[in-house]
Amino acid sequence: MPDQDTKVRFFRVFCWCPVLRMVRIMLMHAVRAWRSADDFPCTEHMAYKIAQVAADPVDVDPEVADMVCNRIIDNAAVSAASMVRRPVTVARHQALAHPVRHGAKVFGVEGSYSADWAAWANGVAARELDFHDTFLAADYSHPADNIPPLVAVAQQLGVCGAELIRGLVTAYEIHIDLTRGICLHEHKIDHVAHLGPAVAAGIGTMLRLDQETIYHAIGQALHLTTSTRQSRKGAISSWKAFAPAHAGKVGIEAVDRAMRGEGSPAPIWEGEDGVIAWLLAGPEHTYRVPLPAPGEPKRAILDSYTKQHSAEYQSQAPIDLACRLRERIGDLDQIASIVLHTSHHTHVVIGTGSGDPQKFDPDASRETLDHSLPYIFAVALQDGCWHHERSYAPERARRSDTVALWHKISTVEDPEWTRRYHCADPAKKAFGARAEVTLHSGEVIVDELAVADAHPLGTRPFERKQYVEKFTELADGVVEPVEQQRFLAVVESLADLESGAVGGLNVLVDPRVLDKAPVIPPGIFR
């Protein structure tokens, strides 16, 4: 018989508001491959259990609803800053080729467009600068990637604000819980494989679909969003921004087919030819995935964290550390070497443990540089700050003094940092590093930082004020001040928005800004 569930407790600890500490009852689900001949009923499938969570009509806690609004503001901030970048312009042009009478909104422009294509364009805009929220555990995730597809569907179907919030809370919960339990990168599978099912589950909650429909939508979404991590390896291309947008678009289409009565490959995770057996750890391995027990509130969004700096999340604390260290070092020309002791994930994904020579190439793409901790640490050390455009400018990367310092920096895995990275207690998790700076004199300067300043446990944690400041700063010169304030007012009242009013979440960009976007050659969609 299938493995039984075991109840476990997770503690939520938030430094900015101790009263929010609480205990949630979670069910820990054993997930492994089964042979087709085995007795493995549908009700035991992981997709079915996720569908149960999605269909559970629990209330949304006020602080959770507030955080949803924060992340909508955060996405809008990053989208505004990315409006004239080439990948965003390409995705927008594709979406504008799909107008419909009663559709969704494309960020920055007027009109009504097919929800799947609007989600595509808005997903690329939100992801392009690698500047919105993150959750790190067994795998990596950017759960705000769920926002564009759910908002697009809500706009096309006239869903009210409260239902949109419910859907996003589910999407965050499922995305984060899968990230806690199933490691994808170990098997070179891209982390959008957790996003597709989360989008399907979130839409299911938002539309109050039945459990069976959600189950099939989840199965289809996972089946179609498993891809390799080559998108984040070596010379990283603009597809890194398109990948989550594609998963969101696929998730919408999966729900649409399931609503029309179509089924899905099953059991998608556990099948003899399924994801675990052939794409992940194989038939001998058992994963353990936590999900809220029936009736339990969905609060996982509160365990995620946004970015103050436009770079891979595991570089957030090192950037703050570099800014702090520069005053102690003084003359940077006196540096002989810098070794960053950090977690396994950080070492192999953005550090020298990746073995990617492209991470030291002054002519590398922006996407490659934002996954190069040696480059990021060097620039932050020299400038004492980080900027989403100036820090990546080609002339900045090619500066001779930067290249020289950059090549003095390496990373090593430290078992203690790896342990803290995977710690189940949010109050003890750490995503930082210890820097050992050796000067030509032989002096060694050592400092470390566990979490970024903007992290909930950091020195300057992000709250609504900081989210709004990030939006107004990045939207400056892109979105008129009156439009900025209109958008923020709509977000503030999201829970009270009636059917049809969610379209107000779109932000219109000054047409003169869009005129600066690169000229894109025509494609198939016109």
Swiss-Prot record:
The pathway to which it is assigned is: Organic acid metabolism; propanoate degradation; Carbohydrate metabolism; tricarboxylic acid cycle; isocitrate from oxaloacetate: step 1/2
Q: Name one Pfam family in it.
A: MmgE_PrpD_C
Instruction: Give the signal peptide as a residue range, or say none if absent.
Output: none
* A Gene Ontology biological process term: cholesterol metabolic process
Q: Which domain of life is it from?
A: Bacteria
EC top class named in words: lyase
Briefly describe its induction. Activated by PrpR.
Give the catalytic activity.
(2S,3S)-2-methylcitrate = 2-methyl-cis-aconitate + H2O; citrate = D-threo-isocitrate
Q: What's a single GO MF annotation on this record?
A: aconitate hydratase activity
Q: What is its EC number?
A: 4.2.1.79, 4.2.1.3
Q: Report quaternary structure and partners.
A: Monomer.
Extra facts: The vitamin B12 restores growth of the prpDC mutant on propionate as the sole carbon source. It suggests the capacity of the MCM-dependent methylmalonyl pathway to support the metabolism of propionate independently of the methylcitrate cycle.
Could you tell me what this protein is called? Answer: 2-methylcitrate dehydratase
Q: Which gene encodes it?
A: prpD
